[in-house]
Structures are given as C-alpha cells and as structure tokens.
Amino acid sequence: VAKEQELTLREGVYMYFPGPQFETPAEVRAARVLGADAVGMSTVPEAIAAAHCGYEILGVTLCANMAAGVLPQPLSGEEVNEMAEQSAPHFSSLILGCLERL
C-alpha cells in the first residue's frame, strides 16, 4: 500500500516513554544506546491492550518530531500538532488501504 501511494515507511525499534512530558535529551541518548530508532508516548499502550484482548496487532506510528536533544531548538507540542495535521491525509490513506486488504 505504501509503495502504491508513494509513501516512505521505515522499520525500526520504538521505545515507549509514558509522558505526558516529552522525553529528555538524556533519555533519548539512553534509548539510542539501547538500540531504539525512535521514541514516543503512543502505540505501546494500545498494542498492549489489544494483545491482552487476544487481537493480532500491527504497530504503525507517525513520528511527528525529532527527539529531545537531536536538534538545537526545544520540543514543541505545536510542532507535533502541525506535523500530525499535515500528515493526516497520507496516514489515513495508508491505514485505510491496509484495512481494505485484510
């Protein structure tokens, strides 16, 4: 589906941080040492709940910002919201395309 829609997907190790605050630069460095390619506050709780219910799961996460300490500017919730809004049509199309093939 992603190829048909000319979307770039990446596979990697996702490390969950519970939030609600952004991860710190030190946590990001530790996650990198432990092999994480991305960090975030979503996907994992939903996957745990679904697995607990006996569902088969596929985790797909939109990485909406660079992790703390990667770029010189501080993280911003506004930045995350803007990226999510910009990506929503493509992300929705990807998910709907996958669901149509089940």
Predicted regions span which residues?
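Glycine-rich phosphate- or other oxyanion-binding loops that anchor nucleotides, phosphorylated ligands
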Residues: 1-62, 66, 78-102
